[in-house]
Amino acid sequence: MISDMKMKYYMAPMEGLTGYIYRNAYHACYHPMDKYFTPFLSPKANSSLSFRELNDILPEHNQGMYVVPQILTNQAEDFIRTAKELQEYGYSEINLNLGCPSGTVVSKYKGAGFLGLPDSLDRFLDEVCGKMEGMGMELSVKTRLGLVSPDEFTGLLEIYNRYPLKELILHPRVRTDYYKNTPNMPAFGSGFDGSRAPVCYNGAVSYTHLIHSRCCYCY
């Protein structure tokens, strides 16, 4: 039962803030997190990780922590190529960013913008999950409820449930909410109950009483 399980806490990524220097300082000075997610890596076609991205994921910069690299892309081949590169550095779990609400990201149909293309997202996950399973790697997904309406999540969850996701990290807002408005906890509850993968909460941490009653993971 959930009440008998220890709540796990993850450090959510924040671009320009939660790089390896911050992660190491937090890990040394405060209560260690169960997982640390990197600020998103944004692969370019036929290109390796940038110096800045590589510096952030180097094992020697992340000792003693369970670190999960996060990738922001809508191109399966770019995701897979980057996952292979990360595997060479010892990583076995990768997170897909489907939550970023930034206008410059969404306009390219990445992050939360990818949620508006469910058929393309389905094909992306089919290709990525097939390749990663063969590589012995695991995929987790960070998602919102939808692009403009929480009603979109019913169809999105059907897509997610087709694949062997390690975790589904659910931010119960839509893209147009950005980080404002009240998290849609009924929708989160539906996602928690309906997901084949373990569900992790992401959003306003002031809702801890509701999170603890439903969930074992907080991001």
Regions found by a protein language model. Give the residues of each.
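Glycine-rich beta-strand-to-loop/alpha-helix junction loops that act as flexible
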Residues: N97-C100, R173, C200-V205, Y219
